[in-house]
């Protein structure tokens, strides 16, 4: 297993030199954030990014994400131009030595929360999702804006985009995803690029929009769209684990051990607080609803060799910055995972 860390570029208050100091840290997960969605990532920009990361003794392990343009998700006639651009970006990333791309197919919005600074009993703050609060919100009125969302369309554009999705149900979205996969995977195969779709977060429909990468059956349906070892998933325990329907160990055993299609792992804990509601918490098993020992053991049992990262953390010790992506709690999560891996591996030898 290759430990990696999410980094949001030179404007990220979490610096590469700090990330390098985390025990066992090998790689960086990042992207180029100033290129408009749907445009080609120039090779020279990718090489600049890689050089910056390598100058700190780290590896550019995973690109997360190359965003998928909404015209592709909507299945509009213009989608082929954007898919062509996406394919060229895959080629450029492969030429630069990148071998894994994490992406998602969530309509309009990326990961969604109702509060970015919910105060826990210990005084730390975290991200939470309260279904009742979300139901009262209207994102078209600017009532909710989160890191990672593409807001380039503006308020008027967002209303129009939401209107376009009124005729898109789950099966139409599946059809549009399949079209995209059939196009990009032919090239990904040739350049040996592992394409790892991220589950929808949260794994249910929001604001009347369909979401389809949500559970075991849908992940299996996705994997079966294209027969290639490079067509796979990012298994995010936080996204999938916020509903009791999803069994993380079962998913790791099937999609990892049996199918070998887990190309990237996001490791974080969540505490389920109600139907379709949850808090993000420390990685420790007792802090949330997931058994982190069993999750990490499932990866170790089949010798998962791919990249993983400690995912969202709380804000602790007075740290400020990008919600969910501070240094301190994610570093604690990394060290906790280090300890689990070492103990599990040594126990296997005895």
Swiss-Prot record:
On whether Flavoprotein is a keyword of this UniProt record, the answer is no
Protein name, entry field: Mannonate dehydratase
Q: Which GO MF terms are attached to this record?
A: ferrous iron binding; manganese ion binding; mannonate dehydratase activity
Q: Which GO terms describe its biological process?
A: D-glucuronate catabolic process
| Pathway(s) this gene product operates in, as recorded in its UniProt entry | Carbohydrate metabolism; pentose and glucuronate interconversion
Main EC class the enzyme belongs to: lyase
Biological source species: Clostridium perfringens (strain 13 / Type A)
Q: Which InterPro entries match?
A: Man_deHydtase, Xyl_isomerase-like_sf
What Enzyme Commission number does this protein have? 4.2.1.8
Q: Which domain of life is it from?
A: Bacteria
Function comment: Catalyzes the dehydration of D-mannonate.
Question: Required co-factor?
Answer: Fe(2+); Mn(2+)
Give the record's keywords alphabetically: Iron, Lyase, Manganese
Q: Does the keyword Transcription apply?
A: no
Q: Catalyses which reaction?
A: D-mannonate = 2-dehydro-3-deoxy-D-gluconate + H2O
The similarity comment for this entry is:
Belongs to the mannonate dehydratase family.
């Amino acid at each position: 297993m290759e430990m990696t860390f999410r980094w949001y570029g030179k404007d990220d208050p979490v610096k590469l030199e700090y990330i390098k100091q985390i025990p066992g840290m090998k790689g960086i997960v990042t992207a180029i954030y100033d290129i408009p969605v749907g445009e080609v990532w120039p090779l020279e920009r990718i090489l600049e990014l890689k050089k910056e990361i390598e100058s700190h003794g780290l590896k550019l392990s995973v690109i997360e994400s190359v965003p998928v343009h909404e015209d592709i998700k909507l299945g509009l006639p213009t989608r082929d131009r954007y898919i062509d651009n996406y394919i060229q970006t895959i080629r450029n990333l492969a030429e630069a030595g990148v071998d894994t791309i994490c992406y998602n197919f969530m309509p309009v919005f990326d990961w969604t929360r109702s509060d970015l600074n919910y105060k826990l009993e210990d005084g730390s703050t975290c991200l939470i999702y309260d279904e009742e609060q979300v139901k009262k919100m209207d994102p078209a009125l600017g009532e909710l804006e989160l890191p990672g969302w593409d807001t380039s369309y503006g308020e008027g554009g967002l209303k129009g985009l939401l209107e376009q999705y009124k005729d898109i149900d789950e099966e139409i979205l599946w059809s549009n995803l399949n079209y995209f996969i059939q196009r990009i995977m032919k090239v990904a195969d040739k350049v040996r690029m592992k394409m790892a779709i991220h589950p929808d977060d949260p794994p249910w429909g929001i604001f009347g929009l369909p979401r389809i990468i949500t559970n075991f059956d849908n992940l299996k349906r996705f994997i079966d769209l294209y027969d290639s070892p490079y067509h796979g998933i990012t298994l995010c325990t936080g996204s999938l684990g916020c509903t009791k329907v999803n069994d993380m160990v079962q998913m790791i055993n099937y999609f990892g051990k049996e199918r070998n299609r887990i190309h990237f792992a996001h490791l974080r804990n969540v505490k389920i607080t109600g139907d379709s509601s949850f808090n993000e918490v420390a990685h420790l098993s007792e802090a949330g609803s997931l058994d982190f020992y069993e999750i990490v053991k499932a990866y170790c049992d089949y010798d998962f060799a791919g990249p993983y990262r400690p995912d969202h953390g709380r804000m602790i010790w007075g740290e400020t910055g990008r919600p969910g992506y501070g240094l301190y709690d994610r570093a604690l999560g990394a060290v906790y995972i280090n300890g689990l891996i070492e103990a599990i591996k040594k126990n296997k030898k005895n």
